Amino acid sequence: MGRRAPDRLDRGVTTTSPRTQAPPQAGRGVHATARIRATSHDGVTVLPLLRSDGPFHLRQLRNHGSQARVCVVSAMSAPLGGDRLAIDVSVEAGAQLEITTAAATLALRGATTDHATYDVTLTVGEQATLYWLPQPLISTRGSNLRQTYTVDLAPTARLILREELILGRAHEPPGDLSSHLTVHRDGRPLLAQHTTFGSTAPGWDGPAVLGEHRATGQILIVDPAFANAPPATRLLGDEPANGEGIVAPLAGPAVLATALAPTATPLRHLLDDAVRPRTPCST
C-alpha cells in the first residue's frame, strides 16, 4: 500500500505491541490481520478495538459528529507476492464508521512468484452505517493479487463501499488481479461479483470487457430507504472514449454504480457523479 519502500526490513513488526517478530523467511510473505470494532456509546461512536498489524497502521481521525473515522496508513510496501493480508471490520448496532486509506494501494511483484491475498471482512449491525472509501488499487507489472470482500449486513444496516482498480502504471501492462465481492443482507445473498484481469483472463482487454480502458470501479450503496424508493437507472458519461458507466438498482434496497475509463482521474469523476460520499483522510 502507498509508496514503495526501498526494502522490507521493517516487515514483521506489529504496531500494537512492543514485541518484534522474526523476519519472514526468504521467498515467503507477510501474514497480517488488522482489526477494527466500532460501538455506539451515548449516541457517539467509539472504537474499543483498533489493532494495527503488518503493513496496516490504523490512524483514528477526529469524529465527524457522532461518526468515527479511521484512515489506513501504509507502514511498508504491500501487498507483495506471498503476502497474506486481511482487514476485519465490525460495526455494531447504532454505530457509524468511515474507513479510508491515505494513499493508493500498489500490488507489487515481490521476491516470490506466489500470489498475494488481501481479504476484507465487513460486518455491519442493526441501525449501523459503514463507509468503506479506500483510494485506488493499482495492479503493477508482474504482480499477482487475489482480493476478496466479504460483507454481512443486518436488515437495517447501511453501507457505502467504493472500489477502484487501476490496471498497470503509466505505459506498462498490469499484473494478474482478481477481485471477488460477496454481500449478504439479513442472511440472504444481495450481490456476488467476480472480476479477473491480466494473463489469467484472456479477453479482459477486448471490446467485450474493458477495450482500451485501464481503470474500472464501482460504488455499492445499501440503504433500507431504497425499499420504498429505489433509485432510477441512469447512464454515466457523455463521451465513451473518456469513460462510461451506469447506475442501477439491485434486487434489494441497494444500488450499484459501475464505471470504466482510460485512467484513474476520469474514473473517479464518473463515480463521483454517480454518488458523492465523503472524501477521505482529512483531519
Swiss-Prot record:
Molecular function as annotated in GO: nickel cation binding
Predominant location: cytoplasm
Biased composition (Polar residues): 13-23
Gene Ontology cellular component list: cytoplasm
Family annotation (InterPro entries): UreD
Chaperone among keywords: yes
Keywords assigned by UniProt, alphabetized: Chaperone, Cytoplasm, Nickel insertion
Glycosyltransferase among keywords: no
Localization per Swiss-Prot or TrEMBL: Cytoplasm
Bias-annotated ranges (Basic and acidic residues): 1-11
Signal peptide: none
Function: Required for maturation of urease via the functional incorporation of the urease nickel metallocenter.
Similarity field: Belongs to the UreD family.
Subunit structure: UreD, UreF and UreG form a complex that acts as a GTP-hydrolysis-dependent molecular chaperone, activating the urease apoprotein by helping to assemble the nickel containing metallocenter of UreC. The UreE protein probably delivers the nickel.
Protein name: Urease accessory protein UreD 2
Protein source organism: Saccharopolyspora erythraea (strain ATCC 11635 / DSM 40517 / JCM 4748 / NBRC 13426 / NCIMB 8594 / NRRL 2338)
This protein's encoding gene: ureD2
